[in-house]
């Protein structure tokens, strides 16, 4: 499987409403989105690609209460760290957000992921 399909499976186990990039309008709460933010290409001195990829991944959680969204992002951090499909390291604590147009609380955390190419 690809890192993205492994990530989707891992996140769906914590929240069945998990989507790449953005959730469809009207999605029930809570929900999770994930988006790749680039990363550093890995290679060797002879310019051949390494067998691993380095990806910066943003995980965004949304819920109707601050406590619910904090619990969800913390549960996700725990399973990301424990994953055997890839190596994931948080790049800081989650950032809190509040969406005025949807009245949803958000929690956004970035991870550094190393996975097989």
Could you describe each region identified by the protein language model?
Residues 78-117:
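Acidic-leaning, charged glycine-interspersed low-complexity segments
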Residues 51-64, 69, 105-115:
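Oligomerization/assembly interface segments of phage tail-like spikes and tubes
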Residues 43-45, 52-55, 96-97:
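Short secondary-structure boundary micro-motifs
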Residues 1-47, 67, 71-78, 83:
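Small/polar-rich, solvent-exposed N-terminal microdomains that initiate assembly or binding
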Residues 46-48, 59-64, 84-89, 116-117:
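Short, surface-exposed, polar/charged, turn-prone segments marking secondary-structure boundaries
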Residues 2-5, 60, 64, 83, ...:
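Generic serine detector
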Residues 25, 48-50, 100-102:
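Sterically constrained small-residue positions within well-ordered secondary structures
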């Amino acid at each position: 499987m690809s890192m993205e399909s492994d990530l989707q499976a891992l996140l769906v186990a914590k929240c069945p409403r998990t989507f790449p990039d953005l959730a469809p309008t009207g999605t029930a709460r809570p929900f999770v989105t994930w988006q790749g933010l680039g990363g550093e290409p890995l290679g060797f001195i002879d310019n051949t690609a390494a067998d691993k990829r380095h990806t910066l991944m943003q995980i965004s959680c949304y819920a109707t209460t601050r406590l619910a969204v904090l619990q969800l992002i913390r549960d996700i951090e725990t399973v990301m760290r424990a994953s055997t499909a890839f190596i994931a390291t948080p790049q800081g604590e989650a950032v809190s957000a509040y969406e005025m147009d949807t009245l949803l609380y958000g929690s956004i955390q970035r991870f550094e992921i190393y996975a097989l190419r």
